[in-house]
Structure formats: C-alpha cells, structure tokens
Amino acid sequence: MKRRDFSAQLLGTGLGVGLGAAGMAAAPAAFAQAGPVEGKDYIRLSQPQAVAPGKIEVVDFFWYGCPHCFAFEPSLDAWAKKLPTDVAFRRVPVSFRDEPFGTHARIFYALESLGQVDAMHRKVFSAIHNERAALAKPDEVSAFMTKNGLDGAKFLEVMNSFSVQTKARQAKQITDAYKIDGVPALGIQGRYYTSGSVAGSNDRALAVADQLILRARKG
C-alpha cells in the first residue's frame, strides 16, 4: 500500500485484503542466473544507512492498519524464520501520518518491550482487519490487551513510556532515511530496499531480498 493511499483507507472504512500481482514462481531461478535488477526489482539507497556490525540487517517496514501487510505476514514470518544465522531480522512500524500510525507504532514497541511480539503481533493485525477494531484510542488498546491476557493498564504505561516514544520517533527516522513510500517493504543492510510494488509481488520481493542478502554478504 502506497503512502498516498493511506488517507483514503484509514481504519474503520472496510479495508480489503489483497497482494497485487502474484504467481511469480520462476523468480528465484531467474535471479540465480542474472540477479535482481536495480530500479526494477529493488532500489539502492543514495545515502547508505549505518547498521550494527557482525550481521546482515533485514528490516520489515509495516503498518498494522495496512491490509497488504496483514496478508503478507504469514509468508514473511515463515521466510524470516529460515534466514541464515548471520542475518538479523527486525520490524519497523512506519508513521506516514500522525494518527493512527503513531499509536500503532507505540503498540508494537510496547509489545517488544514486554517480550510479547511473538504472541501478540498477528493478534493485533487480526483485531484490526478481521474484527474491525481500530486500536487507535487508549481505552480500546487497554481493553484489547486485557482480553488477550495482558495487564491493560500496565501496557498503556509502557506504551506511553519515554523509551517506547523514543523508539517510535527513531522508527520514523529510519523510514524516512530509506525513503519508504509504501508498505510492506524490506530494507537490506542499510543499502537497498524492495517491496511488492517494486518487485511485482510480495513473494517476488522475498526472492529479491534473498539475492540482496547474498550480495550484502559478499561486501
């Protein structure tokens, strides 16, 4: 979903779930022969971003309110679990507008701080897209977390903490540095990014990401 599309598809407007183009099963074999093409399959950052030494960084840029991110999550999660040990995978929630992006970013970082991402990440997606829960107001967030076995009041405290707000601001800086204009998108080693809209489909973007990881490993 492109940045410009978000204003027309905010929460509570009956977001549909779709992934755009699909059926690119031949992509991995083609890439193995020729490699992905800059400008067609991926974008090279004009200003590379610093990454932690020792591992190849892969960043999942997402928004809980994005139907494409929700549909992509099972494939992405399965792919991420099979990444080599020298690859570090992390998620970064985007903030293309003030709200509800800011609230959703802080939900993610509060879950991360509490060690609940694995348990709750897909539940947040499902609540928004299957149950039409906006999760944009404190009472909604608290009730949802309580319903799912967490202390709702404590969650709001963590969500509004300085550390979580700092991480949310840093996430916006990372998103801007990568010049992400739509999600889902994948950043590779601070040098490249790809997405379904760039590569042709989200499955094809994963194949491109595999090749960019190989490229980053070579230096």
Predicted regions and their residues:
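C-terminal cap of thioredoxin/glutaredoxin-like
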Residues: 5, 147-219
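Sec/Tat-exported extracytoplasmic proteins
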Residues: 65, 70, 80-83, 111-115, ...
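Alpha-helical elements of Rossmann-like donor-binding domains used by nucleotide-donor carbohydrate transfer enzymes
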Residues: 75-78, 106, 123, 140, ...
